[in-house]
Amino acid sequence: MLHVAHLVETIIVVVAGAAIFGSPSRLHGPLLYDDKAAVQRNPLVSGATPLHRVWDLDFWGEHELSSAESHKSFRPLVTLTYRANYLLHGHDSWGYHAVNVVLHTLNCALVPPTVRAAFGWRDPDELQLVPVAAALLFALHPVHVEAVQQIVGRAELLMALFFLLGFLGNAPPALEPCARTRAPDPSPSPNPD
């Protein structure tokens, strides 16, 4: 069960992330650079190529992975999320940006528990500023901002999401608050005999 302090800090980070990256000007920004090739001109996204071909074609949906023309970029999960976006919003960039903002906000919310887990901070009342500061730094770092702005950055956003979830999945005790315990006394106890 999450402690109230953990919930509050997570809410702060989620709100900050949504406020920073969810502004209308960012959500309605155009598709840029590689976004056009990955989304607008990708036959896997538009449905011109059958969806089961996502396992055979490169990220751009143009070449067989085994062909010499392919650059061997293979991101089927990302392509499937673009296809879902296309089914809901067509080529309107708003939906693609909104998904990236949601993914980034989820990642920001996962940073505080990841920091606590990484450093073994299990007491919910100690060091609350460090996980929040780490999450805000994560939210504002230019590498992550670029990944949110450009639709092709979804690959990085999904990678971060699955990494953070995987890390937390392997560190479950750090997510549960527990009472601070004292280490056992290493000195031998006196023998009553």
Where do the PLM segments sit?
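Polytopic membrane enzymes that build or remodel cell-surface glycoconjugates and lipids
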Residues: M1-D193
